[in-house]
Amino acid sequence: MPKYRSATTTHGRNMAGARALWRATGMTDSDFGKPIIAVVNSFTQFVPGHVHLRDLGKLVAEQIEASGGVAKEFNTIAVDDGIAMGHGGMLYSLPSRELIADSVEYMVNAHCADAMVCISNCDKITPGMLMASLRLNIPVIFVSGGPMEAGKTKLSDQIIKLDLVDAMIQGADPKVSDDQSNQVERSACPTCGSCSGMFTANSMNCLTEALGLSQPGNGSLLATHADRKQLFLNAGKRIVELTKRYYEQDDESALPRNIANKAAFENAMTLDIAMGGSTNTVLHLLAAAQEAEIDFTMSDIDKLSRKVPQLCKVAPSTQKYHMEDVHRAGGVLGILGELDRAGLLNRNVKNVLGLTLPQTLEQYDITVTQDEAVKKMFRAGPAGIRTTQAFSQDCRWDSLDDDRAAGCIRSLEYAYSKDGGLAVLYGNFAENGCIVKTAGVDDSILKFTGPAKVYESQDDAVEAILGGKVVEGDVVVIRYEGPKGGPGMQEMLYPTSFLKSMGLGKACALITDGRFSGGTSGLSIGHVSPEAASGGTIALIEDGDTIAIDIPNRSIQLQLSEAEIAARREAQEARGDKAWTPKNRQRQVSFALRAYASLATSADKGAVRDKSKLGG
C-alpha cells in the first residue's frame, strides 16, 4: 500500500524543521497524517477567463478541509492569448505551457503533496496542468472557471451574437465605421470566463470531461452561473475520497493515468473532431499523451478524423451557437451520447466520479436521463449582464435544446457533415502532417490550388494582406513560426481575421508551421511538420510555386519535381549555420525563448521538449 507522499515532510524526528514550517502555515498536530492536497489555482487580473478565480481556490480548500484533508493553494502563471496576439507577446504563449507544467511539478514534488485540484480555464493553462497531472500521476480533479457569456449587440435593427473574433475582424475592416467597430468591441466580451466560442480554452475544458478528469458540465456551464459553484464544492470533497482510495486502499484506478488511458484519449479526440474543436487541442493532446506515456500519435488522429462526423457547430464556425447554446443542448455529455449511439466511443472508461461512460450517459445525457436536477442544470443560461463575478446569476432557459435534427447538437443521421471538424493532411509539403479545422472551411474551397505568397513572419504577412498584396486565389505561406523557428509557434488569428476583413476569407488559403487560435476559421492549415527550422519542405517554397490542397483526400502537395525540391534543399544546406533560418527577418529573441527553442520539437510531436537532447 502506498505511503502518503506528505509523510516525508510530516513524520519523523528528523523532519522537525519541516513540521515547524508547516505549523507556521497554520497546520496543527491533528493535521499531520492527513493528506495534503494542492489547490493549483491560476487566478490573475490579466485574463478574463481567470479574473474571477481568486476566491474559488478558497472554496475548494474549505471543502477539502471539511472532508478530512489539508489544503494548500498556489498559483501558476496564465497568459491571455487574445491580449498577447498580434505582437511579440504571442511568442511566449505556447512556451508558457511548459512553464506551467514544470511549475506544478516543482511545487507539488518540492512539498510532497499527495493530490491536486487544478483550477484552470484558458488556452495554455489547462494543457499545462494536464501535462503536469499525467507526469506526476497522483490523484487529480480539474475544475475550470467556465465559459464567458456570448456578447450581443444590435446591428441593422437585428440582435446578433458576438465574440472576440468579431471585434478583431470589424476593427480591421475598412468598410466598417468607427462607431460600429467601437460598438462591437464594447459588446464582444461581456463577462468573466473563457471566450464564448469553441476556441482553445473551451475545447480543452470539454476534453477534460471526455478524458474523465473533470465533472459533467465542466466544459459548458457558464462562469457566471450559480450552478457552477457546485462543481467547485464537489471537487473539494471528491478529491479527498480519491486520495484516500489510492493511499489507504491501494486503488490505482484513482490515478489520472488509469482514468485518462489510451481509450479515454481516443474518446477525447473523437469528441474534438465531432464538435469542431480548436486545432490547438491536437497539439495539447499529443503533448499530454507523452506525459502519460501513451502511444497516441498523429496517425491515431488521422484514423479517427476519417470516420467521425461533425455533430456540433459552434462559433467561430457559425455565429448561431456559442458555448451557452452547447450547454443548453446537453454539453459534452450530449455530444458523447450521440457518438456512443453511433458506436464511435470506447465504453470501458471511467471518470473521477467513478462512473463508467454508460453510467455517466444514463445520468447526464439529456435525451435519456430521468434526473430533473440534471435537466435543470443544463437549462442554466446567460443573464446578459456585464460582470467579472463568478456565480453571479441564476437565469435559465425555458426549455432544453434536445432537437437532434436541427438543433445545436445533431445525431449521426442529421450530422452537419459526415466528415469531422478536424483533418490531418499529408504530402510532400508536410511529410509528418498538418492540421486543418474543416468545421470552419466553406465547401467551395475544400479543394484549392493556387500560387504561393511566402512570408517569413506573421508581421510581414499581415502587412501584405492589409496592403492589398494578397489577392483572390493566393496561398499565403507563413514559415519559421513553428515551435523552434518562431520560437514559440505563434497563433495566426490576425492574418486569418484580416483575410476576412479584406473579403478574402473564402478566396485564399493560409498555410503555416505556426498554429491558429481556436477563433480561426477559413482555409487555414497549421502545424506543418517538419517545421521550416527543422528542415521541412515549407522552408523551400518560393513565391509563385503552385500548392494543391485536397481536404477530402487528406492531401497537400507542392507541385514541384523531386529533383527541384532536392536542388533547393542542397542550396539551403549550403548556407551553413544560417541554413533553415529566415533570410531577412529581424526579431529580438530573449534568452528564455532561445532556451525553449533549443529543445522544442515540431507540432506533430506536440511541440514538447526533445528528451533525447537531455540524456539520461
Curated annotation (Swiss-Prot):
Keywords of this protein's UniProt record, alphabetized? 2Fe-2S, Amino-acid biosynthesis, Branched-chain amino acid biosynthesis, Iron, Iron-sulfur, Lyase, Magnesium, Metal-binding
Q: What single Pfam family name could you report for this chain, choosing any that match?
A: ILVD_EDD_N
Active site per database record? S517 (proton acceptor)
Domain of life of the native organism: Bacteria
Identification of the protein by name: Dihydroxy-acid dehydratase
Cystine bridges:
none
Pathway named in the protein's UniProt entry: Amino-acid biosynthesis; L-isoleucine biosynthesis; L-isoleucine from 2-oxobutanoate: step 3/4; Amino-acid biosynthesis; L-valine biosynthesis; L-valine from pyruvate: step 3/4
Q: Which family does it belong to?
A: Belongs to the IlvD/Edd family.
Source organism of this protein record? Salmonella paratyphi A (strain AKU_12601)
Q: Which PANTHER family match?
A: D-XYLONATE DEHYDRATASE, D-XYLONATE DEHYDRATASE YAGF-RELATED
The enzyme's first-digit EC class, named in words, is lyase
| InterPro entries assigned to the protein according to its UniProt record, in alphabetical order | Dihydro-acid_dehy_C, DihydroxyA_deHydtase, DiOHA_6PGluconate_deHydtase_CS, ILV_EDD_C, ILV_EDD_N, IlvD/EDD_N
N6-carboxylysine sites (modified residues):
K124
Q: Does the keyword Nucleus apply?
A: no
* E.C. number: 4.2.1.9
BP GO terms, sorted: isoleucine biosynthetic process; L-valine biosynthetic process
Q: Which reaction does it catalyse?
A: (2R)-2,3-dihydroxy-3-methylbutanoate = 3-methyl-2-oxobutanoate + H2O; (2R,3R)-2,3-dihydroxy-3-methylpentanoate = (S)-3-methyl-2-oxopentanoate + H2O
> Its biological function?
Functions in the biosynthesis of branched-chain amino acids. Catalyzes the dehydration of (2R,3R)-2,3-dihydroxy-3-methylpentanoate (2,3-dihydroxy-3-methylvalerate) into 2-oxo-3-methylpentanoate (2-oxo-3-methylvalerate) and of (2R)-2,3-dihydroxy-3-methylbutanoate (2,3-dihydroxyisovalerate) into 2-oxo-3-methylbutanoate (2-oxoisovalerate), the penultimate precursor to L-isoleucine and L-valine, respectively.
Q: Where does [2Fe-2S] cluster bind?
A: C122, C195
Q: Which GO terms describe its cellular component?
A: cytosol
SUPFAM superfamilies assigned to the protein according to its UniProt record, in alphabetical order: IlvD/EDD N-terminal domain-like, LeuD/IlvD-like
Which residues of this UniProt protein bind Mg(2+)? D81, D123, K124, E491
The record describes how the cofactor is bound as:
Binds 1 [2Fe-2S] cluster per subunit. This cluster acts as a Lewis acid cofactor.
Gene3D superfamilies in the record: IlvD/EDD C-terminal domain-like
